[in-house]
Each structure stands twice: as C-alpha cells, then as structure tokens.
Amino acid sequence: MRPSKRAPDELRKVTLEKGVARYAEGSCLVTFGETKVLCTASLEERGPPWLRGSGKGWVTAEYAMLPRATHERNRREVTAGKPSGRTQEIQRLIGRSLRAVVNLPAIGERQIVVDCDVLQADGGTRTASITGAWVALHECFTWMRGRSIISVDPMRDHVAAISCGIHKGIPILDLDYDEDSAADTDANFVITGSGGIVEVQGTAEIAPFSEEQFLGLLRLAKAGVAQLVALQKQAVG
C-alpha cells in the first residue's frame, strides 16, 4: 500500500478553476490534493527583442513559491537577488511545455507571460503548474479572440504533466511529498492531449530502474494525463 492509501494508478483529487484572477487575461487555480498553484496569463503587446520583425510571438513562464507554501518559511528569492537553479529549471520547463502546443506565429509579435505561484506545496508543483498553466493560457487566447486581437486560436493541442514513481517495487501515479521522499524512483512526464511526449525527467534515487519499469511508468503517466486533459476540457467548457 502506498503512503497516501490511494490505488497505484489513482490521481489525487484534481480541480481546475478558471477566471480566478480579476485583472489577468487568463487565470486558473489548480489543485492536486494539497498542492495548490495560482496560474495567470498576461498579454504583453511587445514580444522579445530577438523576435522583432519575425512575425512570431512568444510564450514564457515564471514560477515561484510563497514563503509559507511549505512546512517552514522559505526566504523570498527576490531578497537573494536571483531565482534559484530549481526555480529556473521549472519555469523553463513550463515555458517549453506550453510552446510545444502553441502556434507562435498566430499570436503576432506579442508575448504572453504565464506566472505560476505555488500557494501550498505537497509534491508535484511543477506538474500542477503545467496543467493549470494550459488552462490560463487557453483563457488568455479566448480573451484575445473575443477582442479581435487575434483571428484564429493559437492553441494546437492540450498539454498536461504528471509525476510517477516506483515505491517498494510498485509503479505509482501522482506522488505527494511523503511518497516522493520515500520513492525508489521518481519521474515527471509532460504529454500532449494527442499522446505526444514533450519532456521526461526521471531519477533513480536508490538503484537504477529497468527499461521495462520505465515503460510501465510511461503507460501510467499517459493514463494519468488523459484524465487531466479531460478535466482541462471540462474546465474551459
């Protein structure tokens, strides 16, 4: 039995609530069990300087954790002068994941910044961020189309992310903090609605895992992402 008492292939309770931020062009409050992330998408009329004249837009992301998102207060990274290596890795992952399903020329020479702020962390903050960020970005595109800023929907597909791991030899889906801490292996999968793999991050904590075990985790992740995509569809109507 896994620490959370869930079945090996069972997600935590996941909710996706759009339109929670009054001023953002798109927003979503995403929860994976006790992990809660606020995702907002903001339209900037100017794209990055290096894309000027290309006719192409850009989607990027920023990620942060509130000081008391964890058991003990963490110092705000702004007071340290720069984001940590972990923060930079995660926000780049979120940006890559979103761009994988966006037709960038359809945005025009504009930039959309998706901010993912962790309100409470209990494992899987990066996977929750990607899943909620897609909803926020979708809402931003809907807002833009409603005001004739763009004429076509730039979103080509869904994208969501989920963690998997091996706990006492058993593959499990959607690890919370306690499970992640005790897992023999943990991995994050970013997968599109059509089943395309955007990114895989996997680490053996105790002993190497086999190809067969990896494929088992992949199958588990694909099934989990299919459930998340269904929830995204429900959230955006």
Curated annotation (Swiss-Prot):
Transport in keyword set: no
UniProt keyword annotations, A-Z: Nucleotidyltransferase, RNA-binding, rRNA processing, Transferase, tRNA processing, tRNA-binding
Enzyme class at the top of the EC tree: transferase
GO molecular function: 3'-5'-RNA exonuclease activity; tRNA binding; tRNA nucleotidyltransferase activity
This enzyme's EC code(s): 2.7.7.56
Gene Ontology terms: biological process: rRNA catabolic process; rRNA processing; tRNA processing
Catalytic reaction annotation: tRNA(n+1) + phosphate = tRNA(n) + a ribonucleoside 5'-diphosphate
Binding site for phosphate: R86, G124, T125, R126
Domain of life the protein comes from: Bacteria
Protein family membership: Belongs to the RNase PH family.
Quaternary assembly: Homohexameric ring arranged as a trimer of dimers.
Functional note: Phosphorolytic 3'-5' exoribonuclease that plays an important role in tRNA 3'-end maturation. Removes nucleotide residues following the 3'-CCA terminus of tRNAs; can also add nucleotides to the ends of RNA molecules by using nucleoside diphosphates as substrates, but this may not be physiologically important. Probably plays a role in initiation of 16S rRNA degradation (leading to ribosome degradation) during starvation.
The protein's name: Ribonuclease PH
